[in-house]
């Protein structure tokens, strides 16, 4: 069993190299085998003015950056790197935001103190099923998460998916599906800042102690984080590095952060929100020419 699993890890590394070299392929309808991925989304844990910048620009209370007072052009935003830290915004920043995700995002909505925010979440959802699983009901009509999102316009869209996908061992499919979803979000939300949140680490010791699935590893999770960073660079959307903010010295989620090794405790959901509030960027900063790249 362990020999077979180690070979899966080796294969994952080989596939990652191929994916990073290939870039986004045309829309890929292969979604991996459902038999290889169990649902990991059931949790038992759920417990004003402008700020001047050194270059003369300013950041308003809602986190929007303006050009320097002398009218000079700011350096182009570097989509290949994680979003840099910015002055903290308050919860009102998220009033025109939508959050897409699985049960981890559901926990963020419930336990972080973010307030009333539009969420498009579903327990057990994966990037492979985002365009096919009718998980959202609006006025008695069932929609996929992508279809439901198109019913309203937002200025920010946050997406965080990948834990339920770890068992598929389909890295190219994960990458291609993520690219397609970002394209779909851009099409339905042309004026939104899109934030891809990478995956917060797992605590493998806790998962093992609770008899959790062997495929839930930080090694494969880091592969997915590399892939989502590449998606952000290629599609020119914002990449948020939650992993680095939460990983412990041993390369895992701290033991006190989760009772099942996957979902967070209340204090850590609050820390997640604080990270989001200190990593924001305006649409104008990202796309000074007035339109997001395709």
Where are these predicted regions, by residue range?
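Catalytic His-Asp segment of secreted/periplasmic serine-dependent ester chemistry enzymes
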Residues: 202-294
């Amino acid at each position: 069993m362990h020999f077979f699993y180690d070979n899966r890890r080796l294969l994952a590394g080989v596939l990652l190299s191929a994916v990073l070299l290939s870039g986004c392929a045309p829309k890929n309808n292969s979604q991996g085998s459902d038999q290889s991925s169990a649902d990991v989304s059931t949790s038992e844990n759920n417990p004003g003015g402008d700020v001047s910048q050194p270059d003369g620009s300013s950041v308003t209370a809602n986190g929007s950056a303006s050009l320097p007072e002398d009218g000079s052009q700011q350096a182009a935003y570097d989509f290949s790197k994680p979003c840099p830290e910015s002055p903290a915004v308050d919860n009102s920043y998220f009033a025109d935001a939508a959050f897409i995700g699985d049960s981890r995002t559901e926990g963020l909505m419930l336990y972080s103190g973010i307030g009333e925010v539009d969420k498009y979440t579903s327990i057990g959802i994966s990037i492979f099923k985002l365009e096919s699983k009718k998980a959202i009901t609006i006025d008695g009509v069932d929609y996929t998460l992508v279809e439901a999102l198109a019913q309203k316009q937002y200025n920010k869209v946050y997406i965080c998916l990948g834990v339920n996908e770890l068992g598929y061992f389909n890295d190219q499919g994960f990458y291609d599906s993520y690219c397609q979803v970002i394209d779909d979000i851009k099409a339905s939300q042309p004026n939104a800042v899109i934030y891809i949140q990478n995956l917060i680490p797992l605590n493998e010791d806790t998962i093992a102690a609770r008899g959790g699935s062997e495929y839930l590893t930080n090694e494969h999770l880091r592969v997915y984080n590399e892939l989502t960073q590449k998606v952000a660079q290629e599609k020119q959307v914002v990449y948020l590095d939650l992993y680095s903010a939460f990983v412990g010295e041993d390369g895992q989620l701290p033991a006190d952060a989760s009772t099942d090794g996957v979902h967070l405790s209340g204090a850590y959901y609050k820390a997640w929100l604080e990270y989001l509030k200190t990593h924001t960027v305006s649409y104008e900063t990202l796309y000074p020419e007035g339109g997001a790249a395709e």
